[in-house]
Amino acid sequence: MRKKEISMKNRRATTRRMRDLLAGLLLLSTAGFTAQTQAGVALGATRVIYPAGQKQAQLAVTNNDDNTYLIQSWVENADGAKDGSFVITPPLFAMQGKKENTLRILDATNGQLPQDRETLFWMNVKAIPSMDKSKLSDNTLQLAIISRIKFYYRPAKLALPPDQAAEKLKFRRSGSSLTLINPTPYYLTVTELNAGTRVLKNALVPPMGEASVSLPSDAGREITYRTINDYGALTPRLKGVMQ
C-alpha cells in the first residue's frame, strides 16, 4: 500500500511540474511576440465619388510613419467581392516614410452600370509594414491594416442635386422597426437618428430603396437625423415625422 501511495504522490508531483513548465513556456512564447498595429498610413478622404464620364478619380495616401509600407489597393462590389469595374493604379507599390502618393481610379465599366442611380462599391487600401532586418530573428508579429471606405459611382444628370437628397427621406413604423424610405437616386448614410428621446442605430439607405432599424415601443413619432455628405462631413440636423 505504501508503495502505491508513494507512486501516486510522485505522479501528482510530476503532473504539477509539467503544468507549471507548460504555463511558463506559454508565458515566454506570448512575451516573445509583439503585436505591432500599424496606424501610420492614412487616406485623404472617407469616401470616393466617381462622377460618370470623368477620366479618373483620385485618392491621396499619406505615410505619417518613418517606416516603409507596401501599399496594395483594390475595389470590391457592394457584397464585398473583388470587382474589376474599376482599375486602380498603381495597384501595388512601396511607400517611404513621411511621403504621400496618389491612387488613380479608372472606369472600366463600359457604361454597364445603372444610369438612374448611384452604385456602391468599396475601396480597400492595405498597408503592409516592412520588416526591420535586425529583428528578423525575433518572434515579432507584423499586422497589415486595411482601410475600407465607400466608393460611389455617380451617373451624370441625376434629377436631384446631392445636397437636397437628405431632406427627402421618409419614415414609416413597421411593428418594432422603423423603415427609412429613400426616394432619391443617392445613397444616404443616416446618423444621429432619434425617434423622440430614443437613440436609434445608424443606417445606409440605398437609392430608391429602404432600410430598417429596431424601434423601441415607447419611441416618439418625431424623427431627427443627420446624414454624411460627399466630403465626409455631417449635414445640419433634419426633422421628419413617422408615418
For each feature predicted by the language model, list its residue ranges:
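Bacterial N-terminal signal peptides that target proteins for export
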Residues: 6-24
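Bacterial N-terminal signal peptides
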Residues: 23-32
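Beta-sheet-dominated interaction scaffolds and their linkers
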Residues: 38-60, 161-170
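Buried hydrophobic-core signal for structured, non-transmembrane domains
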Residues: 57-63, 105, 121-126, 177-181
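Short acidic, flexible loop segments centered on an aromatic residue
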Residues: 64-81, 183-198
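Intrinsically disordered, low-complexity Pro/Gly/Ser/Thr-rich segments with frequent PxxP/GP/PP motifs
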Residues: 83-111, 197-222
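Terminal connector regions
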Residues: 110-158, 221-243
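Intrinsically disordered, low-complexity segments enriched in serine, threonine, and glycine
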Residues: 171-243
